[in-house]
Structures are given as structure tokens and as C-alpha cells.
Amino acid sequence: MAVAPTAREENVYMAKLAEQAERYEEMVEFMEKVSNSLGSEELTVEERNLLSVAYKNVIGARRASWRIISSIEQKEESRGNEEHVNSIREYRSKIENELSKICDGILKLLDAKLIPSAASGDSKVFYLKMKGDYHRYLAEFKTGAERKEAAESTLTAYKAAQDIATTELAPTHPIRLGLALNFSVFYYEILNSPDRACNLAKQAFDEAIAELDTLGEESYKDSTLIMQLLRDNLTLWTSDMQDDGADEIKEDPKPDEAKN
């Protein structure tokens, strides 16, 4: 007779099912149930990747919507179409409320459960990086004091992650590389510091290249993919400093993307 799955196993299975169906809001709900049922135990690598993928898709859809609406708003403003601009601003505000709610949800979970229960170096860096990412997403659309606060929280989280990564993870470790990628994007996009962005990305790339021969087969694909993204951004940013380019800046891919 088959052993009945535990509630944890059932929720993980349902999260995978929701992912296949591209129902990411429900995937978030299932993975939050897993996270909240753990006590002081930490998520497995598979579970934390599922949680990350769920939230990345939910937030990613809204970030894309916000960028499209903001671009339309700028065009209508330049045409002096005030009536349309007012409608667009209202709609943008609705998307921003959704973005805030999603970020607040994962940030609460990270602070209350995931970061305190993280035991290994890679899980600490993973969750602190995640904390930095979601504060950065807030900084993308917040203004004034709220933007300043979100940017400061991003910097604090990324720096804490970086301190652990440089002492506990190899330069070729995908999580360390992903952190360097997103931290450099933060310097470039949020702090408007292209020099610091390029220095951080170049240092991470050079350190990984120097140890490429030590890479294990299981993380080779993930690491080299992120290294390529670091190089793409460096190319884009150095050309942008010479002219005003508008190509897409690359961020750390979702865990499932890195494995394809």
C-alpha cells in the first residue's frame, strides 16, 4: 500500500503542477504554505527554486506591464494628450499597487522565515540576494523618500549577501555570479553609477574565468550562462557610455531557465 504524501510533499507537487499550467499566483500560494509549515527547518534547494520561480513570474509580468504603460505615458505626455495621460496614470497606479503587494509578501516571508532559518552559505546568499532583488523592484517605480528607502534596503541586502558569497562561495558558483549580475544592474539602473556597475560585473566575470577549470559538470551550464549575461551587460554599458543605447539589460535568470 502506497504511503500517503505529507502536506509538504503535496504542496510541492501542486506547486509543480501550477508551474506547468503557468498559474504562478497559485504556485506562490502553494510554496508559501510549504515555507510557513517549516518551523526552524529550511527549504530544500528544489523548494527554494520553486518559490523563486513562482515569485519571479508573478512579479515579472507586472514589471513588464509597468514598463509598457510608462513608455506609453511618456509618448502621450510628449503629444500633450492630458486626458489620456490621466487615464494612464490611474492604470499605472493600479499596477504599482500590485507590485507593492507582491514585494511586501515575499519580503515578509524572507525576514520572518527564510533568512533566519538559512544554515548554509549558499542558502544565506540566495535569500539575501532575493531580498535585495525585491527591494530593487520597489525602487524601480517608487519616488521620493520611498525610492530612497527601497534603494538603501537593496544595497544593505546585496552587500550582506556579497560579504558571505566572497568568503563561502567559489567565484564560479551560480548564486555568487547571479548576485554580482543583479547587484551591478542595481548600480547601473537605480543608483545611476555605470562605473561601479561595470567594475563589479567585470571583477565577477574575471574571477570566474580564472577558476573556470574547477567548475563541476552540474553547475557548468548555469555558471557559464550567467557569465555570458555579465559580459552582455558590460558590452551594453560600455557602448551606452558612448551613446544613448536602449537595449535590454540582463538580470539573473530564473532557476528553471538556467537549467534549460
From Swiss-Prot:
InterPro entries: 14-3-3, 14-3-3_CS, 14-3-3_dom_sf, 14-3-3_domain
One of the GO BP terms on file: protein localization
Cysteine pairings via disulfide bonds: none
Top-level lineage group: Eukaryota
GO cellular component, one term: cytoplasm
Pfam families referenced in this protein's UniProt entry, alphabetically: 14-3-3
PANTHER family in alphabetical order: 14-3-3 PROTEIN
Family of the protein in this entry: Belongs to the 14-3-3 family.
Name used for this protein in its record: 14-3-3-like protein C
Upper classification of the organism: Eukaryota, Viridiplantae, Streptophyta, Embryophyta, Tracheophyta
